[in-house]
Amino acid sequence: SVAEKSTPQPDNNPLDCRPDGFGSGGHGTHVAGTAAGYGVTANGTTYRGDYKNLTEEQLKGMSIGPGTAPEAQLLAIRVFGCYGNSSVVMKALDTVMDPNGDGDFSDRADIVNLSLGGEFAPADDPESYMINTMARQGVFTVAAAGNANNYNGVGDTYSDSGSPANA
């Protein structure tokens, strides 16, 4: 059914939207790599060394440096369809709070990244309310804010922060 297909879950193949094999933009994958990527050596292999002892010289020699927290564990949850629409953000936030669905929040995520948002959404919309509830439980939220381009081409005037960044 449609409801089953819309249920957020770990995505084993986050680049499977387009039939040409090039993915659908890869924004979430890119953000995950920035946050917790291992890094890629000059010969194209995954870096498997000790991050605490990684020297500046070694880092400069890498094709892609490691993310900010390369030893972090990630729970990747797709909330957007292939063309950018979603009705499952709240279900995804429920999953962040209780990944195995057993009602025990002790296994919740420590941080949630929401590289998404909308303009002009009220601060009391369901997503913002959930973000505030999660904060009270100790979940730190990082959300997109003010990056919806400029207003009518007027210089450096950029959009305000909509939901969920205005939580």
Where do the protein language model's features map onto the residues?
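Subtilisin-like serine protease catalytic core
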Residues: 1-88, 104-110, 123, 135-138, ...
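Sequence contexts marking disulfide-bonded cysteines in secreted/extracellular proteins
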Residues: 16-18, 95, 156
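Generic anion/oxyanion-binding catalytic loop in active/binding sites
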Residues: 20, 101, 116
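Short, well-structured alpha-helical segments in soluble
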Residues: 93-105
